[in-house]
């Protein structure tokens, strides 16, 4: 089939982008990558269409090249297309370089044994160096763009394989001083330098002459794959993340590293060279460069952080957020070794003033507030109980950062966090100056509670109030002077608006005991002081179920007895029973017995009466420890026919599909060789009774068509199950791995899913016999098949070892269904049909004591290595 037209490709790409997985599983998915590579060389397609094809290959490399071999083939084809381009300017050179790099990196094919890698790496290094590659390969008008693109490609490969460019440091350093794209070269050199320093420290080696050696980009290659293997592809993080600058790398990269005086001098010169040209870079690139160099030099002996001082002076007044973030990352990395006290005070003042600018958009405003909050000197550095470092952030400095009810919620919470930092300081406030931070905090919280208490007020106001209360409780947990008014204020809020009970329950679940226990006492007092016929009875019962315990038993029971007469619907009755359950677990007995007897007789709902009767029986027959165990969370799944599920497990868990250990085992049975398709015979075995079992199978790659699920109504342990038949639809005759997923229902009614061990389809599992020829025509039939394989097919000869069973035993055990002509015990002709449309023919003749020569013919050359491995392994197969 010839190349597709532009419209046909547009339609095909549109269908692919709409659903890549569905397209690749369809009939056109298998040929998409091959057609794309082929049509890139077609003269009928415009360059614009080819660029769109290359863009697709860069966006979806995993779908187009699913494994390393496919990625290797794709990269080789892309490089061939690049070489075949005419010497005139073309819009395809840069996309082809990027596409080849993406294919190798994403497909996992980059390595010393990859032919495409050995072609691409010298090409990229030569382009980055601006070398003359001959044959007018790089037109003059494309010199700088291609040089920049080559640097970007090398940076991507260095990121995938850290240490790859360790031998090119001297060359890259020399290129930085020449005319060329400064930004790509700077970032490439910084990344390669960072990776090399970290990896060399792991093996205890120095830089040697790496920073001074000028290797030839077209020579044998400066690639150090041993250093790449040491890196193992896991040098993270690649982006600024402070204050834990090296959290992802671990302690090994933080160990002090010392170089020889000559190495230290060359390293210092390289870093200074990069820093001196950093002002030519964009703000984002400058930030990345500073981060890479900061991480590289942190922990290096003989490399003072003062190298960054000129950049620090330049950046202290920057308005670029990315550069400010990079500067704070340097502060987190080097601390006082780079920043003086004056620098820290100036930087903090700069942050606080910038955060007060009225024209800042909300994200920028929150960023400045986050920087102020994360400023290292704003946090106590000593352990609890010891004197901590004083805060640089004082009331005078952050006067304009105090929170107000007029701020939006996120800004208010961030400013409230700052206010909590001020309140945590125990320094006395000077009279006549600002009001006390704690007094301001109490007024702010009172205002938030007042807004949350408004009847009909928006839910967001109540949510903000509880978020602020939680933040204060976390920051000031050890200060009773703050927590006491907070507790009483929250109690007044509940008294004014009981419908906020769910918020209180959530707050009690989240806070520590310093706030939780006294708040529970106050809330219980508020609830039991209300009349039992209150219109907010449902909220009171919900709150009481959370705060009820063994204290104040009489007041709680009196409230419940008064409320029982007003619990006329199912919701209220269930709420009342939940409070009784909480009292049972708390060890309350006494008057609870009488209350449960009354409820067992008077409740209208039969389910409620059953609950009350059950609680009464448990209370009468179990001691307190056993009662707590009986009413506690159960590890066993309860029966689903009762609403008791809502108490022990919840309806949500009963209705959701839960992940669970596999309760079914799956094994492969004997191979079935009948029918038009190969069929796997599966033998299931259940560990527990399961129902409505559905087995789903997924084949890695595009080797087979999607497999249908297999359904089993019931499986029980100890009871033999019927074998399951799984038809296979191979798209090519090759072994495969089947991932198995089980979905089933347990005897308790829960729906669970589990991943089973994978199943492996062997080459022999695909064998099918040809139709049996008429009697006496077997030899002619086989010879006709034998001759039809050539010249398009392939043939080979293999030595097949024989075990003690001899040739006749080997054939009868493994190949008997496929024998067309037999002259036992010395000669056999075997014809095997391999779906979808291939054949494998074997002649086994002149057997010796230890083996037999086998002549093979097939119309599919890819079958030969599989057939050879299969025949050589027959003797070992028992």
Swiss-Prot record:
Q: Which domain of life is it from?
A: Eukaryota
Q: Where is this region: Disordered?
A: 234-260
Q: Where is the composition biased (Basic and acidic residues)?
A: 250-260
**One GO term of the cellular component aspect?**
AP-type membrane coat adaptor complex
Q: Which InterPro entries match?
A: AP5B1 (IPR038741), AP5B1_barrel (IPR048980), AP5B1_C (IPR048981), AP5B1_middle (IPR048979), AP5B1_N (IPR048978)
Q: Give start-end ranges for the coiled-coil region(s).
A: none
According to its UniProt entry, the protein's GO biological process terms are:
endosomal transport; protein transport; vesicle-mediated transport
| Alphabetic keyword roster | Protein transport, Transport
Known function = As part of AP-5, a probable fifth adaptor protein complex it may be involved in endosomal transport.
Assembly behavior: Probably part of the adaptor protein complex 5 (AP-5), a tetramer composed of AP5B1, AP5M1, AP5S1 and AP5Z1. Interacts with ZFYVE26 and SPG11.
> Could you identify this protein by its name?
AP-5 complex subunit beta-1
Instruction: Name its species.
Output: Homo sapiens (Human)
């Amino acid at each position: 089939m010839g190349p597709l037209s532009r419209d046909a490709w547009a339609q095909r790409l549109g269908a692919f982008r709409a659903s890549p997985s569905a397209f690749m599983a369809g009939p056109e998915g298998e040929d998409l990558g091959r057609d794309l590579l082929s049509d890139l060389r077609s003269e009928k397609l415009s360059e614009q269409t080819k660029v769109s094809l290359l863009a697709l290959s860069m966006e979806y490399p995993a779908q187009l090249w699913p494994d390393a071999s496919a990625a290797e083939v794709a990269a080789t084809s892309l490089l061939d297309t690049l070489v075949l381009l005419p010497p005139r300017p073309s819009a395809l050179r840069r996309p082809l370089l990027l596409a080849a790099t993406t294919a190798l990196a994403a497909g996992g094919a980059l390595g010393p044994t990859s032919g495409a890698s050995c072609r691409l790496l010298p090409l990229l290094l030569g382009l980055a160096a601006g070398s003359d590659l001959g044959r007018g390969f790089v037109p003059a008008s494309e010199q700088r763009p291609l040089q920049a693109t080559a640097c970007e490609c090398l940076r991507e490969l260095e990121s995938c394989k850290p240490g790859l460019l360790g031998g090119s440091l001297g060359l890259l350093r020399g290129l930085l001083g020449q005319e060329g794209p400064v930004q790509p070269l700077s970032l490439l050199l910084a990344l390669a330098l960072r990776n090399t320093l970290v990896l060399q420290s792991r093996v205890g080696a120095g830089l040697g002459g790496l920073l001074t050696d000028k290797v030839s980009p077209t020579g044998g290659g400066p690639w150090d794959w041993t250093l790449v293997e040491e890196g193992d592809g896991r040098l993270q993080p690649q982006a600024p993340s402070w204050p834990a600058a090296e959290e992802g790398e671990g302690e090994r990269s933080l160990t002090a590293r010392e170089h020889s005086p000559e190495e230290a001098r060359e390293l210092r010169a390289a870093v200074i060279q990069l820093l001196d040209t950093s002002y030519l870079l964009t703000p984002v690139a400058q930030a990345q460069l500073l981060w890479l160099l900061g991480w590289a030099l942190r922990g290096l002996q003989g490399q003072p952080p003062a190298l960054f001082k000129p950049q620090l002076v330049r950046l202290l007044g920057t308005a670029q957020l990315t550069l400010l973030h990079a500067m704070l990352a340097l502060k987190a990395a080097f601390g006082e070794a780079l920043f003086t006290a004056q620098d820290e005070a100036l930087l903090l003042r700069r942050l606080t003033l910038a955060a007060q600018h009225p024209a800042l958009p909300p994200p920028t405003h929150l960023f400045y507030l986050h920087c102020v909050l994360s400023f290292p000197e704003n946090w106590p550095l000593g352990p609890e109980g010891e004197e901590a470092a004083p805060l640089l952030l004082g009331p005078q400095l952050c006067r304009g950062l105090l929170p107000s009810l007029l701020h939006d919620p996120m800004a208010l919470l961030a400013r409230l966090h700052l206010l909590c930092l001020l309140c945590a300081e125990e320094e006395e406030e000077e009279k006549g100056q600002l009001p006390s931070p704690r007094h301001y905090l109490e007024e702010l919280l009172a205002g938030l509670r007042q807004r949350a208490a408004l009847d009909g007020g928006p839910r967001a106001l109540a949510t903000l109030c509880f978020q602020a209360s939680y933040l204060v409780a976390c920051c000031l947990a050890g200060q009773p002077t703050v927590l006491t008014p907070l507790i009483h204020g929250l109690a007044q809020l509940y008294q004014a608006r009981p419908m906020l009970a769910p918020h209180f329950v959530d707050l009690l679940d989240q806070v520590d005991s310093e706030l939780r226990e006294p708040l529970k006492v106050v809330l219980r007092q508020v609830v039991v002081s209300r009349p039992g016929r209150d219109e907010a009875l449902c909220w009171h019962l919900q709150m009481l179920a959370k705060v009820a315990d063994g204290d104040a038993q009489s007041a709680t029971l009196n409230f419940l007895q008064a409320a029982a007469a007003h619990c006329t619907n199912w919701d209220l009755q269930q709420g009342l029973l939940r409070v009784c359950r909480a009292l049972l677990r708390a060890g309350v007995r006494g008057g609870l017995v009488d209350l449960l007897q009354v409820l067992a007789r008077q409740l209208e709902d039969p389910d409620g009466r059953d609950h009350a009767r059950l609680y009464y029986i448990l209370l009468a027959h179990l001691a307190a420890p056993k009662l707590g165990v009986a009413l506690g969370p159960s590890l066993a799944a309860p029966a689903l026919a009762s609403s008791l599920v809502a108490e022990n497990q919840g309806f949500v868990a009963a209705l959701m599909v839960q992940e669970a250990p596999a309760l079914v085992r799956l094994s492969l049975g004997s191979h079935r060789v009948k029918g038009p398709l190969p069929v796997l015979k599966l033998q299931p075995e259940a560990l527990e009774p399961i129902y409505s079992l559905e087995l789903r199978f997924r084949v890695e790659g595009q080797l087979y068509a999607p497999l249908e699920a297999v359904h089993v109504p019931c499986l029980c342990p100890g009871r033999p199950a019927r074998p399951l038949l799984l038809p296979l639809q191979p798209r090519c005759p090759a072994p495969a791995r089947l991932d198995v997923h089980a979905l089933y229902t347990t005897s308790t009614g829960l729906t669970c899913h589990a991943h089973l061990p994978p199943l492996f389809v062997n080459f022999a599992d695909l064998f099918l016999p040809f139709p049996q020829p008429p009697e006496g025509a077997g030899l002619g039939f086989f010879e006709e098949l034998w001759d039809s394989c050539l010249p398009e097919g392939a043939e080979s000869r293999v030595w097949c070892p024989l075990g003690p069973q001899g040739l006749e035993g080997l054939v009868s055990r493994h190949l008997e269904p496929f024998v067309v002509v037999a002259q036992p015990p010395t000669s056999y002709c075997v014809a095997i049909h391999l779906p979808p449309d291939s054949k494998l023919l074997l002649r086994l003749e002149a057997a010796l004591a230890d083996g037999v020569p086998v002549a093979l013919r097939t119309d599919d050359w890819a079958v030969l290595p599989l057939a050879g491995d299969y025949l050589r392994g027959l003797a070992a197969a028992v």
